[in-house]
């Protein structure tokens, strides 16, 4: 089961399913940001984080880097949303999330990449 969030995105004028994510604070380590975002958006902490690598979503016009992590050994805590954040967390079985990707219900690129990579690594026995 993975934690996902439903969030209205004004640019797209629709609510989208996404993995927890956020921007790095100035000088922030990507690993620390991953831990922070999981707690802020899903109200969870984890015993273990495994990097799934990084990717460049918009190489034609931006230097953005997306770092992906999988968190295991989860513990409930409290959400800490930013003042301008309005989202709803939900637990989704990985197989259901995969079906949502394949049916087009999940449209967010980083979420699609993360779910597909996680599913592949699990199938290969690498996680």
Q: What annotation goes with each model-predicted range?
A:
Residues 14, 80, 118:
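Short glycine-/acidic-enriched loop or helix-start segments at secondary-structure transitions
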Residues 23-109:
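Unchanged
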Residues 1-36, 127:
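Conserved Nudix-box catalytic region and its N-terminal flanking loop in Nudix hydrolases
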Residues 120-127:
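Generic C-terminal helix-cap and adjacent flexible tail
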């Amino acid at each position: 089961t993975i934690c996902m969030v439903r969030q209205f995105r004004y640019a797209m004028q629709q609510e989208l399913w996404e993995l927890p994510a956020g921007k790095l604070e100035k000088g922030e380590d990507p690993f620390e940001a991953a831990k922070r975002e999981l707690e802020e958006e899903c109200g969870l902490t984890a015993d273990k984080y495994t990097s799934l690598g990084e990717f460049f979503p918009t190489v034609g016009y931006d230097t953005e880097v997306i770092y992906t992590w999988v968190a295991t050994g989860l513990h409930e805590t409290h959400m800490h949303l930013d003042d301008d954040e309005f989202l709803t967390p939900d637990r989704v079985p990985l197989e259901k999330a995969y079906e949502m990707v394949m049916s087009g219900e999940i449209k967010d690129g980083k979420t699609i990449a993360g779910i597909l990579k996680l599913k592949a690594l699990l199938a290969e026995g690498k996680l």
